[in-house]
Amino acid sequence: MSIITDILGREVLDSRGNPTVEVEVYTEDGGFGRAIVPSGASTGEHEAVELRDGDKSRFGGKGVLKAVENVNGPLAKEIVGFDTTDQRGIDAAMIKLDGTENKGKLGANAILGVSLAAARAAADELGLPLYEYLGGPNAHVLPTPMMNVINGGAHSDNKVDFQEFMIMPVGAKSVREAIRMGSETFQALKSLLSADGKVTSVGDEGGFAPDFANNEEPLQYLIKAIEKAGYKAGEDISIAIDVASSELWNNEDKTYKLRWSTGEEFTTPEFVKYLEGLVAKYPIISIEDPIDENNWEDWASITKELGEKVQLVGDDFFVTNTDYLRKGIKMGAANSILVKVNQIGTLTESLEAIEMAKEAGYTAVVSHRSGETEDTTIADLVVATNAGQIKTGSMSRTDRLAKYNQLMRIEEQLGDTASYKGINSFYNIKK
Protein backbone atom coordinates (compact mmCIF):
# COMPACT_ATOMS: atom_id res chain seq x y z
CA MET A 1 0.00 0.00 0.00
CA SER A 2 1.02 3.60 -0.63
CA ILE A 3 -0.78 5.85 1.83
CA ILE A 4 -1.33 9.54 1.10
CA THR A 5 0.11 11.57 3.99
CA ASP A 6 -0.18 15.14 2.77
CA ILE A 7 -1.95 17.23 0.13
CA LEU A 8 -0.92 20.79 -0.66
CA GLY A 9 -2.73 23.20 -2.96
CA ARG A 10 -1.55 26.59 -4.18
CA GLU A 11 -2.52 29.34 -6.60
CA VAL A 12 -0.32 29.54 -9.72
CA LEU A 13 -0.77 31.07 -13.19
CA ASP A 14 -1.85 29.58 -16.51
CA SER A 15 -0.76 30.51 -20.03
CA ARG A 16 -3.07 33.53 -20.11
CA GLY A 17 -1.67 34.87 -16.86
CA ASN A 18 -4.83 33.91 -14.99
CA PRO A 19 -4.78 32.07 -11.66
CA THR A 20 -5.27 28.32 -11.56
CA VAL A 21 -4.87 25.51 -9.04
CA GLU A 22 -1.73 23.46 -8.49
CA VAL A 23 -1.83 20.43 -6.18
CA GLU A 24 0.93 18.28 -4.69
CA VAL A 25 0.30 14.83 -3.18
CA TYR A 26 2.81 13.09 -0.90
CA THR A 27 2.86 9.45 0.25
CA GLU A 28 4.38 7.77 3.29
CA ASP A 29 6.99 5.97 1.21
CA GLY A 30 8.25 9.06 -0.59
CA GLY A 31 5.90 9.11 -3.58
CA PHE A 32 5.19 12.55 -4.99
CA GLY A 33 2.79 13.88 -7.59
CA ARG A 34 2.11 17.39 -8.86
CA ALA A 35 -0.63 18.56 -11.22
CA ILE A 36 -1.80 21.93 -12.54
CA VAL A 37 -5.38 22.40 -13.69
CA PRO A 38 -6.13 24.01 -17.10
CA SER A 39 -8.94 26.46 -17.89
CA GLY A 40 -11.13 27.07 -20.94
CA ALA A 41 -12.22 30.27 -22.71
CA SER A 42 -15.05 28.79 -24.77
CA THR A 43 -16.91 26.62 -22.26
CA GLY A 44 -19.96 24.41 -22.53
CA GLU A 45 -22.84 25.44 -20.27
CA HIS A 46 -22.98 21.93 -18.81
CA GLU A 47 -19.31 21.75 -17.80
CA ALA A 48 -18.22 21.07 -14.24
CA VAL A 49 -17.86 24.35 -12.33
CA GLU A 50 -14.50 26.05 -12.07
CA LEU A 51 -14.51 27.83 -8.71
CA ARG A 52 -13.34 31.45 -8.87
CA ASP A 53 -13.17 33.92 -5.99
CA GLY A 54 -15.07 36.81 -7.57
CA ASP A 55 -12.95 39.30 -5.62
CA LYS A 56 -12.43 42.12 -8.13
CA SER A 57 -9.47 43.44 -6.15
CA ARG A 58 -7.45 40.32 -7.07
CA PHE A 59 -6.91 39.19 -10.67
CA GLY A 60 -10.15 40.87 -11.72
CA GLY A 61 -12.16 38.35 -9.73
CA LYS A 62 -10.46 35.31 -11.26
CA GLY A 63 -8.48 34.27 -8.19
CA VAL A 64 -8.73 30.66 -7.00
CA LEU A 65 -7.95 31.02 -3.30
CA LYS A 66 -11.31 29.46 -2.38
CA ALA A 67 -10.50 26.41 -4.50
CA VAL A 68 -7.04 26.21 -2.92
CA GLU A 69 -8.61 26.43 0.54
CA ASN A 70 -10.85 23.52 -0.41
CA VAL A 71 -7.81 21.49 -1.45
CA ASN A 72 -5.95 22.22 1.77
CA GLY A 73 -9.04 21.89 3.96
CA PRO A 74 -11.96 19.51 3.31
CA LEU A 75 -10.40 17.62 0.39
CA ALA A 76 -7.11 16.98 2.18
CA LYS A 77 -8.98 15.89 5.30
CA GLU A 78 -11.04 13.45 3.23
CA ILE A 79 -8.28 12.00 1.06
CA VAL A 80 -5.26 11.79 3.38
CA GLY A 81 -5.07 8.15 4.46
CA PHE A 82 -6.22 6.75 1.10
CA ASP A 83 -4.04 4.31 -0.80
CA THR A 84 -2.81 6.48 -3.66
CA THR A 85 -3.45 3.65 -6.15
CA ASP A 86 -7.17 3.67 -5.28
CA GLN A 87 -8.00 6.21 -7.99
CA ARG A 88 -11.67 5.28 -8.20
CA GLY A 89 -12.05 5.45 -4.44
CA ILE A 90 -10.29 8.81 -4.22
CA ASP A 91 -12.39 10.35 -6.98
CA ALA A 92 -15.65 8.87 -5.67
CA ALA A 93 -14.93 10.23 -2.18
CA MET A 94 -14.34 13.74 -3.52
CA ILE A 95 -17.49 13.65 -5.65
CA LYS A 96 -19.52 12.52 -2.63
CA LEU A 97 -17.96 15.20 -0.42
CA ASP A 98 -18.84 17.89 -2.95
CA GLY A 99 -22.40 16.61 -3.23
CA THR A 100 -23.41 18.56 -6.36
CA GLU A 101 -23.90 17.41 -9.94
CA ASN A 102 -21.42 19.94 -11.32
CA LYS A 103 -18.81 19.97 -8.52
CA GLY A 104 -19.84 23.55 -7.82
CA LYS A 105 -19.43 23.38 -4.03
CA LEU A 106 -15.72 22.54 -3.81
CA GLY A 107 -14.86 23.37 -7.42
CA ALA A 108 -13.92 21.07 -10.27
CA ASN A 109 -10.54 22.82 -10.39
CA ALA A 110 -9.86 21.80 -6.77
CA ILE A 111 -11.12 18.23 -7.20
CA LEU A 112 -9.30 17.65 -10.49
CA GLY A 113 -6.02 18.93 -9.08
CA VAL A 114 -6.15 16.33 -6.30
CA SER A 115 -7.29 13.60 -8.72
CA LEU A 116 -4.43 14.11 -11.17
CA ALA A 117 -1.76 14.67 -8.52
CA ALA A 118 -2.81 11.44 -6.76
CA ALA A 119 -2.35 9.49 -10.00
CA ARG A 120 1.09 10.99 -10.49
CA ALA A 121 2.05 10.16 -6.90
CA ALA A 122 0.96 6.55 -7.42
CA ALA A 123 3.02 6.28 -10.61
CA ASP A 124 6.01 7.81 -8.86
CA GLU A 125 5.65 5.41 -5.93
CA LEU A 126 5.65 2.44 -8.31
CA GLY A 127 8.50 3.80 -10.43
CA LEU A 128 6.35 3.83 -13.58
CA PRO A 129 5.73 6.46 -16.26
CA LEU A 130 2.23 7.87 -15.84
CA TYR A 131 1.01 6.40 -19.15
CA GLU A 132 2.12 2.91 -18.10
CA TYR A 133 0.63 3.23 -14.62
CA LEU A 134 -2.75 4.26 -16.08
CA GLY A 135 -2.77 2.01 -19.13
CA GLY A 136 -0.66 -1.00 -18.25
CA PRO A 137 1.52 -2.91 -20.72
CA ASN A 138 -0.97 -2.41 -23.57
CA ALA A 139 -0.50 1.38 -23.61
CA HIS A 140 1.36 1.82 -26.89
CA VAL A 141 -0.61 3.95 -29.38
CA LEU A 142 0.80 7.43 -30.05
CA PRO A 143 -1.88 9.92 -31.08
CA THR A 144 -2.43 11.70 -34.36
CA PRO A 145 -2.21 15.39 -33.40
CA MET A 146 -4.71 18.11 -34.21
CA MET A 147 -2.48 21.18 -34.49
CA ASN A 148 -4.35 24.45 -34.15
CA VAL A 149 -2.33 26.71 -36.44
CA ILE A 150 -5.00 29.36 -37.11
CA ASN A 151 -7.09 30.69 -34.22
CA GLY A 152 -10.43 32.47 -34.48
CA GLY A 153 -13.65 32.92 -32.56
CA ALA A 154 -13.31 33.18 -28.79
CA HIS A 155 -9.60 32.33 -28.99
CA SER A 156 -8.56 35.50 -30.84
CA ASP A 157 -9.46 39.10 -31.59
CA ASN A 158 -9.84 38.70 -35.36
CA LYS A 159 -12.87 38.50 -37.67
CA VAL A 160 -12.91 34.72 -38.12
CA ASP A 161 -16.02 32.84 -36.95
CA PHE A 162 -14.63 29.34 -36.58
CA GLN A 163 -12.58 28.90 -33.45
CA GLU A 164 -9.84 26.63 -34.76
CA PHE A 165 -8.28 25.61 -38.06
CA MET A 166 -6.06 22.60 -37.52
CA ILE A 167 -3.69 20.38 -39.45
CA MET A 168 -3.43 16.64 -38.86
CA PRO A 169 -0.37 14.74 -40.16
CA VAL A 170 -2.34 11.61 -41.06
CA GLY A 171 0.38 10.31 -43.39
CA ALA A 172 3.20 10.32 -40.83
CA LYS A 173 4.81 7.07 -39.68
CA SER A 174 5.53 8.17 -36.11
CA VAL A 175 4.55 10.91 -33.71
CA ARG A 176 8.02 12.42 -34.05
CA GLU A 177 7.56 12.64 -37.83
CA ALA A 178 4.04 14.03 -37.35
CA ILE A 179 5.37 16.79 -35.12
CA ARG A 180 8.10 17.61 -37.64
CA MET A 181 5.53 17.79 -40.45
CA GLY A 182 3.36 20.05 -38.32
CA SER A 183 6.26 22.32 -37.45
CA GLU A 184 7.35 22.63 -41.08
CA THR A 185 3.80 23.46 -42.17
CA PHE A 186 3.46 25.98 -39.33
CA GLN A 187 6.65 27.74 -40.45
CA ALA A 188 5.49 27.68 -44.08
CA LEU A 189 2.18 29.23 -43.02
CA LYS A 190 4.00 31.96 -41.13
CA SER A 191 6.05 32.75 -44.23
CA LEU A 192 2.93 32.95 -46.43
CA LEU A 193 1.06 35.17 -44.01
CA SER A 194 4.04 37.48 -43.58
CA ALA A 195 4.54 37.76 -47.33
CA ASP A 196 0.92 38.87 -47.69
CA GLY A 197 1.28 41.51 -44.99
CA LYS A 198 -0.79 39.64 -42.42
CA VAL A 199 0.19 39.71 -38.77
CA THR A 200 1.88 36.62 -37.38
CA SER A 201 1.19 37.18 -33.71
CA VAL A 202 -0.36 34.14 -32.08
CA GLY A 203 -3.54 33.45 -30.13
CA ASP A 204 -4.16 31.58 -26.90
CA GLU A 205 -3.30 28.19 -28.36
CA GLY A 206 -0.21 29.24 -30.29
CA GLY A 207 -1.80 29.56 -33.72
CA PHE A 208 -1.77 32.63 -35.91
CA ALA A 209 -4.71 35.00 -35.60
CA PRO A 210 -4.68 37.46 -38.52
CA ASP A 211 -7.80 38.92 -40.08
CA PHE A 212 -9.32 37.09 -43.04
CA ALA A 213 -12.14 38.03 -45.38
CA ASN A 214 -14.20 34.95 -44.53
CA ASN A 215 -13.97 31.44 -43.10
CA GLU A 216 -12.66 29.90 -46.32
CA GLU A 217 -9.55 32.05 -46.59
CA PRO A 218 -7.83 30.30 -43.65
CA LEU A 219 -8.53 26.95 -45.32
CA GLN A 220 -6.95 28.21 -48.53
CA TYR A 221 -3.87 29.35 -46.63
CA LEU A 222 -3.61 25.93 -44.98
CA ILE A 223 -3.60 24.21 -48.38
CA LYS A 224 -0.85 26.54 -49.60
CA ALA A 225 1.20 26.03 -46.44
CA ILE A 226 0.93 22.24 -46.62
CA GLU A 227 2.12 22.32 -50.23
CA LYS A 228 4.87 24.86 -49.51
CA ALA A 229 6.18 22.53 -46.79
CA GLY A 230 6.41 19.76 -49.38
CA TYR A 231 3.35 17.71 -48.47
CA LYS A 232 0.08 16.74 -50.14
CA ALA A 233 -3.11 18.10 -48.62
CA GLY A 234 -5.55 15.32 -47.84
CA GLU A 235 -2.91 12.63 -48.19
CA ASP A 236 -0.01 13.58 -45.94
CA ILE A 237 -1.82 16.24 -43.94
CA SER A 238 -5.58 16.68 -43.53
CA ILE A 239 -7.54 19.56 -42.02
CA ALA A 240 -9.75 19.71 -38.92
CA ILE A 241 -11.92 22.62 -37.82
CA ASP A 242 -13.63 23.60 -34.59
CA VAL A 243 -16.76 25.53 -35.47
CA ALA A 244 -17.71 26.13 -31.81
CA SER A 245 -21.20 26.69 -33.17
CA SER A 246 -22.80 27.47 -29.82
CA GLU A 247 -20.96 30.79 -30.08
CA LEU A 248 -22.76 31.42 -33.40
CA TRP A 249 -26.22 30.16 -32.43
CA ASN A 250 -29.05 32.64 -31.84
CA ASN A 251 -31.65 30.80 -29.81
CA GLU A 252 -34.32 33.48 -30.32
CA ASP A 253 -34.52 33.27 -34.11
CA LYS A 254 -33.00 29.74 -34.33
CA THR A 255 -30.21 30.69 -36.72
CA TYR A 256 -26.44 30.49 -36.95
CA LYS A 257 -24.84 33.86 -37.61
CA LEU A 258 -21.31 34.41 -38.90
CA ARG A 259 -21.13 37.31 -36.48
CA TRP A 260 -17.39 37.99 -36.75
CA SER A 261 -17.02 37.91 -40.53
CA THR A 262 -19.74 38.35 -43.15
CA GLY A 263 -22.81 38.57 -40.91
CA GLU A 264 -24.55 35.82 -42.89
CA GLU A 265 -27.35 33.95 -41.13
CA PHE A 266 -28.30 30.30 -41.69
CA THR A 267 -31.13 28.07 -40.60
CA THR A 268 -29.88 24.73 -39.31
CA PRO A 269 -30.40 22.88 -42.64
CA GLU A 270 -28.65 25.75 -44.44
CA PHE A 271 -25.74 25.66 -41.98
CA VAL A 272 -25.35 21.91 -42.43
CA LYS A 273 -25.25 22.44 -46.21
CA TYR A 274 -22.68 25.20 -45.72
CA LEU A 275 -20.43 22.84 -43.74
CA GLU A 276 -21.04 20.02 -46.20
CA GLY A 277 -19.85 22.34 -48.97
CA LEU A 278 -16.61 23.02 -47.10
CA VAL A 279 -16.03 19.28 -46.63
CA ALA A 280 -16.54 18.72 -50.36
CA LYS A 281 -14.19 21.56 -51.31
CA TYR A 282 -11.35 21.06 -48.79
CA PRO A 283 -9.62 17.99 -47.26
CA ILE A 284 -11.49 18.36 -43.95
CA ILE A 285 -11.47 15.14 -41.95
CA SER A 286 -12.87 16.36 -38.63
CA ILE A 287 -15.40 18.99 -37.49
CA GLU A 288 -15.82 19.85 -33.83
CA ASP A 289 -19.11 21.19 -32.47
CA PRO A 290 -20.79 21.79 -35.86
CA ILE A 291 -24.16 22.17 -34.11
CA ASP A 292 -25.22 24.08 -30.98
CA GLU A 293 -24.74 22.06 -27.80
CA ASN A 294 -28.45 21.95 -26.89
CA ASN A 295 -29.86 20.92 -30.29
CA TRP A 296 -29.80 17.13 -29.97
CA GLU A 297 -32.06 16.32 -32.92
CA ASP A 298 -30.00 18.56 -35.20
CA TRP A 299 -26.85 16.76 -34.04
CA ALA A 300 -28.44 13.45 -35.01
CA SER A 301 -29.39 14.91 -38.40
CA ILE A 302 -25.91 16.18 -39.26
CA THR A 303 -24.43 12.87 -38.15
CA LYS A 304 -26.76 11.04 -40.51
CA GLU A 305 -25.81 13.49 -43.27
CA LEU A 306 -22.03 13.69 -42.76
CA GLY A 307 -21.09 11.04 -40.20
CA GLU A 308 -19.69 8.56 -42.70
CA LYS A 309 -17.55 11.19 -44.44
CA VAL A 310 -16.06 13.15 -41.56
CA GLN A 311 -15.39 12.88 -37.84
CA LEU A 312 -18.00 14.89 -35.90
CA VAL A 313 -16.61 15.71 -32.48
CA GLY A 314 -18.77 16.63 -29.50
CA ASP A 315 -17.02 19.08 -27.18
CA ASP A 316 -19.53 21.52 -25.66
CA PHE A 317 -22.11 18.92 -26.73
CA PHE A 318 -20.78 16.11 -24.51
CA VAL A 319 -18.58 18.02 -22.01
CA THR A 320 -16.73 14.75 -21.23
CA ASN A 321 -19.87 13.58 -19.42
CA THR A 322 -20.92 9.93 -19.79
CA ASP A 323 -24.61 10.80 -19.26
CA TYR A 324 -24.57 13.09 -22.30
CA LEU A 325 -22.38 10.68 -24.26
CA ARG A 326 -24.74 7.78 -23.53
CA LYS A 327 -27.67 9.84 -24.80
CA GLY A 328 -25.73 10.82 -27.92
CA ILE A 329 -24.82 7.21 -28.67
CA LYS A 330 -28.46 6.16 -28.30
CA MET A 331 -29.60 8.94 -30.67
CA GLY A 332 -26.79 8.48 -33.20
CA ALA A 333 -25.57 12.01 -32.52
CA ALA A 334 -21.87 12.71 -33.30
CA ASN A 335 -19.30 9.97 -33.81
CA SER A 336 -16.52 11.28 -31.58
CA ILE A 337 -16.04 12.84 -28.16
CA LEU A 338 -13.54 15.48 -27.11
CA VAL A 339 -12.14 14.60 -23.70
CA LYS A 340 -11.11 17.50 -21.46
CA VAL A 341 -10.30 16.42 -17.94
CA ASN A 342 -11.43 19.70 -16.40
CA GLN A 343 -14.83 19.57 -18.12
CA ILE A 344 -15.82 16.67 -15.88
CA GLY A 345 -13.40 17.15 -12.98
CA THR A 346 -11.83 13.77 -12.20
CA LEU A 347 -9.47 11.35 -13.89
CA THR A 348 -11.83 8.43 -13.30
CA GLU A 349 -14.72 10.08 -15.13
CA SER A 350 -12.42 11.04 -18.02
CA LEU A 351 -11.27 7.43 -18.36
CA GLU A 352 -14.88 6.25 -18.27
CA ALA A 353 -15.84 8.64 -21.08
CA ILE A 354 -13.02 7.35 -23.30
CA GLU A 355 -13.95 3.74 -22.58
CA MET A 356 -17.64 4.31 -23.31
CA ALA A 357 -16.85 6.08 -26.58
CA LYS A 358 -14.58 3.33 -27.84
CA GLU A 359 -17.05 0.60 -26.90
CA ALA A 360 -19.71 2.39 -28.99
CA GLY A 361 -17.41 2.80 -32.00
CA TYR A 362 -16.91 6.50 -31.36
CA THR A 363 -13.43 7.98 -31.51
CA ALA A 364 -12.01 9.89 -28.54
CA VAL A 365 -9.83 12.99 -28.86
CA VAL A 366 -7.94 13.92 -25.69
CA SER A 367 -7.70 17.70 -25.46
CA HIS A 368 -6.00 20.63 -23.78
CA ARG A 369 -7.75 23.89 -22.86
CA SER A 370 -7.01 27.37 -24.15
CA GLY A 371 -5.65 28.31 -20.73
CA GLU A 372 -2.87 25.76 -20.31
CA THR A 373 0.26 25.19 -18.23
CA GLU A 374 3.48 23.18 -18.32
CA ASP A 375 1.55 20.14 -17.03
CA THR A 376 1.81 17.22 -19.49
CA THR A 377 -0.77 14.82 -18.03
CA ILE A 378 -2.90 14.71 -21.19
CA ALA A 379 0.05 13.40 -23.23
CA ASP A 380 0.31 10.42 -20.89
CA LEU A 381 -3.48 10.02 -20.75
CA VAL A 382 -3.89 9.74 -24.51
CA VAL A 383 -1.23 7.03 -24.72
CA ALA A 384 -2.54 5.23 -21.62
CA THR A 385 -5.96 4.85 -23.23
CA ASN A 386 -4.76 4.23 -26.81
CA ALA A 387 -7.25 6.95 -27.75
CA GLY A 388 -5.41 7.68 -30.99
CA GLN A 389 -5.93 11.45 -31.28
CA ILE A 390 -4.80 14.49 -29.30
CA LYS A 391 -5.60 18.17 -29.59
CA THR A 392 -3.00 20.28 -27.85
CA GLY A 393 -2.43 23.44 -29.82
CA SER A 394 0.04 24.78 -32.33
CA MET A 395 3.78 24.62 -32.86
CA SER A 396 4.50 27.58 -30.59
CA ARG A 397 4.11 28.49 -26.90
CA THR A 398 5.85 26.30 -24.36
CA ASP A 399 2.55 25.32 -22.72
CA ARG A 400 1.59 23.58 -25.99
CA LEU A 401 5.01 22.21 -26.93
CA ALA A 402 5.41 20.62 -23.50
CA LYS A 403 2.79 18.05 -24.52
CA TYR A 404 4.38 17.37 -27.92
CA ASN A 405 7.80 16.97 -26.33
CA GLN A 406 6.35 14.52 -23.80
CA LEU A 407 4.78 12.48 -26.62
CA MET A 408 8.17 12.19 -28.32
CA ARG A 409 9.72 11.03 -25.04
CA ILE A 410 7.00 8.42 -24.59
CA GLU A 411 7.45 7.16 -28.15
CA GLU A 412 11.18 6.83 -27.50
CA GLN A 413 10.54 4.92 -24.26
CA LEU A 414 8.12 2.54 -25.97
CA GLY A 415 10.63 1.77 -28.72
CA ASP A 416 9.49 -0.89 -31.18
CA THR A 417 6.17 -1.36 -29.39
CA ALA A 418 5.08 2.21 -30.20
CA SER A 419 2.35 2.49 -32.83
CA TYR A 420 1.27 5.63 -34.69
CA LYS A 421 -2.07 5.07 -36.44
CA GLY A 422 -2.28 8.25 -38.52
CA ILE A 423 -5.23 8.03 -40.87
CA ASN A 424 -6.31 4.76 -39.24
CA SER A 425 -7.12 6.59 -36.02
CA PHE A 426 -10.30 7.59 -37.90
CA TYR A 427 -11.66 4.07 -37.71
CA ASN A 428 -15.35 4.92 -38.00
CA ILE A 429 -15.48 6.97 -41.21
CA LYS A 430 -14.89 6.13 -44.85
CA LYS A 431 -11.40 7.25 -45.86
From Swiss-Prot:
Task: Provide the function of this protein.
Answer: Catalyzes the reversible conversion of 2-phosphoglycerate (2-PG) into phosphoenolpyruvate (PEP). It is essential for the degradation of carbohydrates via glycolysis.
Enzyme category, top tier: lyase
* Protein known as: Enolase
The record's active-site residues are: 205, 340
Q: Which cofactor does it need?
A: Mg(2+)
Q: Name one Pfam family in it.
A: Enolase_N
Q: What GO MF terms are annotated? A: magnesium ion binding; phosphopyruvate hydratase activity
Name the chemical reaction catalysed here: (2R)-2-phosphoglycerate = phosphoenolpyruvate + H2O
HAMAP family linked to this entry:
Enolase
Q: Which GO terms describe its biological process?
A: glycolytic process
- Cite the annotated pathway: Carbohydrate degradation; glycolysis; pyruvate from D-glyceraldehyde 3-phosphate: step 4/5
Q: Does the keyword Secreted apply?
A: yes
What's its EC? 4.2.1.11
- Protein keywords: Cytoplasm, Glycolysis, Lyase, Magnesium, Metal-binding, Secreted
Instruction: Give a Gene Ontology cellular component term annotated to this protein.
Output: extracellular region
Q: Which residues bind (2R)-2-phosphoglycerate?
A: 163, 340, 369-370, 391
Comment on bound cofactor: Binds a second Mg(2+) ion via substrate during catalysis.
PROSITE patterns recorded for this chain?
A: ENOLASE
Compartmental location: Cytoplasm; Secreted; Cell surface
Family to which this protein belongs = Belongs to the enolase family.
Residues binding Mg(2+): 242, 288, 315
Q: Does the keyword Iron apply?
A: no
